[in-house]
């Protein structure tokens, strides 16, 4: 089991420094691959459409996933509902490359997340803080991402979550070893993982940014804040010029600390996706609060 988990962590590590794009058709997947995406997330609807339509959002139709998988050579991810281990079993049977246990879909279980150790396939999970991140890793997640607030085109929550996680990691590194058990209790996280973070000053898996990233500048901001890479959901194919936006965001992640290049790639992209002021959303419409 440990060998399999180390392999899964290494598979996620190979995506470091890259962009993972949400796609709903094989044609979009091809655009993403040509633009330089390191992986795609196969969906029936991007988060902005899930948010607009409401109702219960579930795992995508296997037919769509298989068509997208056949269209590209890069890894393909797909989402399952929090706690819905049967959806995960189906995706594993389809030969998907990564499973995202996602708060963007309607949770199937409000108490339990999926036992990711029961699967051979690597899992991605969202987190708002270090405790959440370490609990998901303790369940077997091979990759963490900020939850942000998907489908809004508003990066503020992704920034908040990344800063919180980084600050909590930094705090752990200042603690004495005899203080770490109390920290584990406070974080509600496994002691061994808390100890690892305190000793290494980082998570034991890669931590990507996600949720509300809509422009090259947003992507570069998250990279400068310490993200290992970026997920872009609605931001590309809800923009005015998806092909150009996709290429620009990939370049922005590569050259995130080069303002001259960022200025160049941000030029002439047309209008970004329509955005939402998160302060005006009802509590029930906030995806990030799903899961624990």
UniProtKB/Swiss-Prot annotation:
Biological-process GO terms, alphabetical: amino acid metabolic process; pyridoxal phosphate biosynthetic process; pyridoxine biosynthetic process
Binding site for D-glyceraldehyde 3-phosphate: 163
Catalyzed chemical reaction(s): aldehydo-D-ribose 5-phosphate + D-glyceraldehyde 3-phosphate + L-glutamine = pyridoxal 5'-phosphate + L-glutamate + phosphate + 3 H2O + H(+)
SUPFAM superfamilies in the cross-refs: Ribulose-phoshate binding barrel (SSF51366)
Keyword annotations from UniProtKB, A to Z: Lyase, Pyridoxal phosphate, Schiff base
Pathway stated in the Swiss-Prot or TrEMBL entry: Cofactor biosynthesis; pyridoxal 5'-phosphate biosynthesis
Key word Lyase present: yes
First-level EC class: lyase
GO molecular function, one term: pyridoxal 5'-phosphate synthase (glutamine hydrolysing) activity
Domain of life: Bacteria
InterPro entries, per the entry: Aldolase_TIM, PdxS/SNZ, PdxS/SNZ_N, RibuloseP-bd_barrel
Known EC number: 4.3.3.6
UniProt-annotated binding residues for D-ribose 5-phosphate: 22, 151, 212, 233-234
Subunit structure: In the presence of PdxT, forms a dodecamer of heterodimers.
Family statement: Belongs to the PdxS/SNZ family.
Role noted for this protein: Catalyzes the formation of pyridoxal 5'-phosphate from ribose 5-phosphate (RBP), glyceraldehyde 3-phosphate (G3P) and ammonia. The ammonia is provided by the PdxT subunit. Can also use ribulose 5-phosphate and dihydroxyacetone phosphate as substrates, resulting from enzyme-catalyzed isomerization of RBP and G3P, respectively.
NCBIfam families attached to this UniProt entry: PRK04180.1 (NF003215), pyridoxal 5'-phosphate synthase lyase subunit PdxS (TIGR00343)
Protein name per UniProt: Pyridoxal 5'-phosphate synthase subunit PdxS
Originating organism: Thermoanaerobacter pseudethanolicus (strain ATCC 33223 / 39E) (Clostridium thermohydrosulfuricum)
């Amino acid at each position: 089991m440990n060998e399999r988990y180390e392999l899964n962590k290494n598979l996620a590590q190979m995506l470091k420094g890259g962009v993972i794009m949400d796609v709903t058709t094989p044609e979009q997947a091809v655009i993403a691959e040509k633009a330089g995406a390191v992986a795609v997330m196969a969906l029936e609807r991007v988060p902005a459409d899930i948010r607009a339509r409401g109702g219960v959002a579930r795992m995508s139709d296997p037919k769509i996933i298989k068509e997208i998988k056949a269209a590209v050579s890069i890894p393909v991810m797909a989402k399952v509902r929090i706690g819905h281990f049967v959806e995960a079993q189906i995706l594993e049977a389809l030969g998907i490359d990564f499973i995202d246990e996602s708060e963007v879909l309607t949770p199937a279980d409000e108490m339990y997340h999926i036992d990711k150790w029961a699967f051979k396939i690597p899992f991605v999970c969202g987190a708002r803080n270090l405790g959440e991140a370490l609990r998901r890793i303790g369940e077997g997640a091979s990759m963490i991402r900020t939850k942000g607030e998907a489908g809004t085109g508003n990066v503020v929550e992704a920034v908040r979550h990344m800063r919180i996680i980084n600050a909590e990691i930094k705090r752990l590194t200042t603690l004495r070893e005899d203080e770490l058990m109390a920290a584990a209790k406070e974080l509600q996280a496994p002691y061994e993982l808390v100890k690892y973070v305190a000793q290494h000053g980082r998570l034991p898996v890669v931590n990507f940014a996600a949720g509300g990233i809509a422009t090259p500048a947003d992507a570069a901001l998250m990279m400068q804040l310490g993200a290992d890479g970026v997920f872009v959901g609605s931001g590309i194919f809800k923009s005015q010029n998806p092909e150009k936006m996709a290429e620009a965001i990939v370049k922005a992640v590569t050259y995130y600390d080069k303002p001259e290049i960022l200025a160049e790639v941000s030029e002439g992209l047309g209008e970004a996706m329509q955005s939402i002021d998160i302060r005006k959303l009802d509590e029930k419409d906030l995806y990030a609060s799903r899961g624990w």
